[in-house]
Amino acid sequence: FKKRAARRCKGKRENTMKTEKFKVTPLERAWILYDVGNSAFVLMIATLVPIFFNALAEAGGVSKVDYLAYWGYASSIVTVVTAILGPILGTLADTKGFKKPIFMLCLFVGVIGCCAMGLAGTWLAFLVIFIIAKIGYSGSLVFYDSMLGDVTTPERMDMVSSRGYAWGYIGSCVPFVVCLALVLGSSAVGLSQMTALSIALVITAVWWLVVTLPLLKKYRQINYVEVEQHAIRQSFVRIGQTLK
């Protein structure tokens, strides 16, 4: 019993030492930073963006019941489109030469959409831009997650991934605090609340893009499959077989 207890204590000490000594590489840090960027967008969407849409909808004569329904419809459209595009994007993420370019495309769609939401003059235009931006964000995550195998080793994946998750939560608060202070104190600086919300969206978009730059600079695709004929169609076939 004493020997088993000693081995367990030794194993715990070794695991603790490994955790304490764990340091991320520059490439791993660049990958983690993308979570810091896109999490700021998610936090903005969950908090301040509905206020912006609410104001636009009321200005457009839309009732409270209707604008809540429209917001739900927009979120549902994003979910359905993302689900349909998922197999296509997943196939492209595994194919040689596609991962980084399409990741950048999705990133720029999300970032530009985030900025453009603040420029929308009507609730309908806002919803259309919101849908496009959210699809861009969701698409980027497909490629971002698939990058982990190129960024680190299998033994380090869990640690790197968990740090991305944690840093994302913490880092997203930085621009959010600035944006929240701007919106709440908009009258003190001579801005309307709508103008402050528009600026907050731009701040979030800039944050998202800037913290992603290290990943765009450092990332190189290592693991891939060669381009195959009918690869996308085969992806849907495999999904159909799985569902059966």
Predicted regions and their residues:
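C-terminal ends and interior cores of transmembrane alpha-helices
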Residues: 107-122
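Hydrophobic core of transmembrane alpha-helices in multi-pass small-molecule transporters
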Residues: 113, 124-140
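Helix-loop boundary and gating motifs at the non-cytosolic
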Residues: 21-79
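C-terminal membrane-cytosol helix-exit motif in multi-pass small-molecule transporters
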Residues: 175, 179-184, 205-224
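Juxtamembrane intracellular "pre-TM" segments in multi-pass secondary transporters
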Residues: 18-29, 220-244
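Glycine-rich segments within core transmembrane alpha-helices of 12-TM secondary carriers
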Residues: 161-183
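Cytoplasmic helix-loop-helix junction between adjacent transmembrane helices
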Residues: 135-166
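Cytoplasmic membrane-interface "Motif A"-like loop-to-helix N-cap segments
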Residues: 93-107
